[in-house]
Amino acid sequence: MANKNFSLTVYDSEYMETNNKIYQENMEKKIRTISEFPDKVLLKILSLLPSKDVVATGVLSKRWRSLWKDVKTFRTSSVESLQLKINPSATNKDIQSLVNMAVARSMRELRIEMICKNFELPKSFYMFSQLETVILDKVSLMDPPPDVHLPCLKRLHLLSVNSLTNVMIFTIDVPTLRILSIDNTSGKSRPKGVHGFVINTPSLSVNVVFDNPYKFLAPLGSTQYLSLCSVTSHTTYRPAVFSFIFLDHLELCLCSAEQWNLLTRILNYAPRLRVLQLKLYHKHCVKDTKNLMGNQPDLIPKSLSSHLEILEWRQYNDTAQEREAAKYILANASGLRKATFYTESTEKHGMLKEVRMCGQRFKNMSACVK
């Protein structure tokens, strides 16, 4: 049965084009009319709109391009991340109000990037924050409390961060923390004296890039994943004993000849180490393999003899020093299941043959050179 109420209207292309043109002209007229209002009125109107729509007005015309930046009130219910790139002329009061806003709105992520600017974070940041990710970049903290308690924090990145106070040891009591990144190799501002950390963070994944990583290793006994980069071969402080009984995965940057000594020390105190990765982390890292082998340990570390399953070596150049280090690991890692070497050398076939010879007594081991 046919539908008696059905109707179909067809417009030709000329009609549609004319209709669209009229619509565009009307919109442009409205924009011109609104743009004739003084800035004070326009800012009042913008302050009543959601922040997303306020920012979108920047494409209307040259005048609107920067007008939205003068809006003082932000209206939103779904923002979870705040990134602040702060001009050195900003005052502590300005910064604290923004951080307090992030805490009050229960934001999940906060990033503060500054250049040689000293400021004091509000107490609410340290005690009442719901933040899960905090990134501080090129920041000098004034009067940080010795004890930091962030109940929801999962990821903490301290990039060229220092303190202007006499506090030399910071306690990070964050049981929920899963990723900690400390990098003090960039920027002109550096800490004076020996700054250290006491860290209470079960199941932690740690990335340390510092001029002397020994400062940070002692309190990281509960860590399961550790990533290390040392930019100097000079170590002035070494704790007597490390304890990495939970360490499962170790990444080590090869930009310092000291790294082999560091590796052998960690292997001695990481009996459950299962994955070992050797590589260069950053563009500024330059491989230093002089005296890479150093003094081989008298006793084969337990982690090598029984637990190590995966070896991955990137930027492998097959130098004499690297070859000796690889032979030592392959010859003693009786539980090794997979060894992978990444190289730009054209002698990959010969390298693979040598690798297999070193580990030929281990029936379950597979080796490849890429």
Curated annotation (Swiss-Prot):
Record PROSITE patterns = FBOX
Q: Where is the F-box domain?
A: 31-77
Residue span, FBD domain: 292-343
**Which Pfam families does its entry note?**
F-box, FBD
Coiled-coil residue spans:
none
Q: Which PANTHER family match?
A: EMB|CAB62440.1-RELATED (PTHR31900:SF34), F-BOX/RNI SUPERFAMILY PROTEIN-RELATED (PTHR31900)
Can you say what this protein is called?
Putative FBD-associated F-box protein At1g50980
Query: What is the scientific name of the source organism?
Result: Arabidopsis thaliana (Mouse-ear cress)
The organism's taxonomic lineage, starting at the top: Eukaryota, Viridiplantae, Streptophyta, Embryophyta, Tracheophyta
